[in-house]
Amino acid sequence: METQIQITCFAALRKFFDPQLNIRLQLPAAYHSVIYELKKLNPEAADLLDHCRIAVNECFVPLTDLKTTDEPVYLIPPSSGG
């Protein structure tokens, strides 16, 4: 089934996307499909997206796991700090 997925972007991703956006996705789909769809929306973000992690329900998920519900997705870019 195709559904709308809410995505929240953090940090450097906000240079390329709004803090919150929605994409349409055919479920079930691997989480890497979210990144694929975002690359189509903004190809300039591809390098950064290749290094991002996805979180759902406050837990990181493997990109190969299947997304089966329309729960929100949080896209976390790499960060450094001290």
Cite the ranges covered by each PLM segment.
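Ubiquitin-like/PB1-type beta-grasp interaction modules and other compact soluble beta-rich domains
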Residues: 1-81
